[in-house]
């Protein structure tokens, strides 16, 4: 199962999953994706 948490450090509109994932790595998450509202959500297995 995958858990999602909105990124605390991502700034601006999320248009690139790669950029989102890079910011999430600095927040100690293994990955991240943009959602439909252009926000960055960090993901991890839970």
From Swiss-Prot:
InterPro entries xrefs: Defensin_plant, Scorpion_toxin-like, Scorpion_toxin-like_sf
Keywords: Antimicrobial, Disulfide bond, Fungicide, Plant defense
PROSITE patterns according to UniProt: GAMMA_THIONIN (PS00940)
BP GO terms, sorted: defense response to fungus; killing of cells of another organism
Disulfide bonds: 3-46, 14-34, 20-40, 24-42
Signal peptide: none
A Pfam family per the record: Gamma-thionin
Presence of the UniProt keyword Isomerase in the record: no
Function description: Plant defense peptide.
Family in the record: Belongs to the DEFL family.
Protein name per UniProt: Defensin Tk-AMP-D6.1
Organism of derivation: Triticum kiharae (Wheat)
């Amino acid at each position: 199962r995958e858990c999602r948490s909105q990124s605390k450090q991502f700034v601006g509109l999320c248009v690139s999953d790669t950029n989102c994932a890079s910011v999430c790595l600095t927040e100690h998450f293994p990955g991240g994706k943009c959602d439909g509202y252009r926000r960055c959500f960090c993901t991890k297995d839970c």
